[in-house]
Amino acid sequence: MKVIIPLAGKGTRLRPHTHVVPKPMLKVAGRPVMSYVMDDVLKLGNVEQVVYITGHLKEKVEAYAKATYPIPSVFVEQAVQDGTAGAVALAKPYIDAPVLIIFVDTIFDADLSIVKDSTDDGIIWTKEVEDYQRFGVVVTDENGHMTKIVEKPKTPISKRANIGLYYIRNWQLLLEGIAHVLTTAPNKGEWYLTDAFQYMIDKGAKIKVVDVEGWYDAGQLETLLDTNRVMLEKGRARKPAQLGEGATIVEPVYIEDGCTIEHATVGPNVSLGAGSVVKHSTMRDTVAGEKVTITNSTLHDCFLGDSVVVEGVKGRMTIGDHSEIRGDA
C-alpha cells in the first residue's frame, strides 16, 4: 500500500505562525499535528512508500519527515496550488498499489487497520456535523456505500462531512477519475479530488462510508486551541520539570522540559514549549512555543510563537515568533 499526504498549502488561516512554520508542523499538546496522523500510518505496518506533496516551506517538512519517520518516502512539489486533485495527480508515477490519502490539517480517531480486509473499491471516512455548509458532505445508499459527494451544500442533503481521509483499493479507476477531472473547467483555479470520487461512483465503484469517533480541526486558529484541549484531555498531560515558589498547575497541561514557573497559575488546557518562563501570571487555554517569557499577565485563548515576550497584558492574542507585546496589566 502507498500513502499520499498532500501538505502544500500555505496555511493562510493560521498566520502569522505559518509564515515560518509549515501548517502540519504546528504543535498541539506538544506535538506537530502531522505526527498524530503518522503514528497511525506507522501502526499499519504494510506501507511500502509515503508520497509527500509539498509546497510552502517544503524544506522544513522534508527535513522533519526524513528525521522522524523510517519509511521509504518521496517528496513532490506542488508548484501551482491547483487543488486537491492536482496534488494527488502529482503522485501518479508512484501509484501502483492501493493508496491511503490523508490530509493532515485534522486529527481523527479512526481504525485504519480495516483497510487490510476491505473488498470495496474504496473507503471514505466521515463525521456527522451540524454546520454541514462548511464541508464536503457524503450521501449513502442503504448499504452504506457513497452515492454522492457534494462540496459545501446549501441544502441539507447530508450532515456526514468528508474529513479528508480516504483509502482507494481501485487505484486504476482513481487515476482515471483524476485525469478526467483535470480535463474539466477548474472551480476558481482548482480541481477537487472529490470530483474524481464521484467519477468512480458513476462508473460503478463501491466506496464504503465509515464514521469516525472523533475529528478535530487544526486548520484554523479558532479550532486549533480546542483541538489542543481535546488532545490534552485524551492523555497528553505532562508536568513540568521545574516548579518554582507559588506555582500552581491545573491539569490537563503539556509543559516541556526546562520551563520555569513561579508565582503563577498555568492551566487548564495549556501547552508550553521548552525553556519558557512564566512568572506572576495566569494562563489557560493557550498554546505557547519554545523560549516564551510571560510576566505580570493574565492570558486566555492565546496562540504564541517561539521566543515571544508578553509583559503586563490581559486577554487573548495571537503572536508570531520573536515578537514582544507589553502593556499595563
Model-assigned labels for residue ranges:
Residues 2-5, 13, 26-27, 31-103, ...:
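Conserved N-terminal catalytic core of the sugar/cofactor nucleotidyltransferase
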Residues 24, 72-74, 145, 206-208:
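Conserved beta-strand segments of alpha/beta enzyme cores
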Residues 51-55, 126, 287, 303:
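Short internal beta-strands
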Residues 25, 138-140, 209:
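A structural signal for short hydrophobic beta-strand segments in well-ordered beta-sheet cores
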Residues 108-183:
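Conserved core of the sugar-phosphate nucleotidyltransferase
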Residues 180-329:
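Left-handed beta-helix
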Residues 10, 105-106:
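Active-site metal-binding loops of divalent metal-dependent hydrolases
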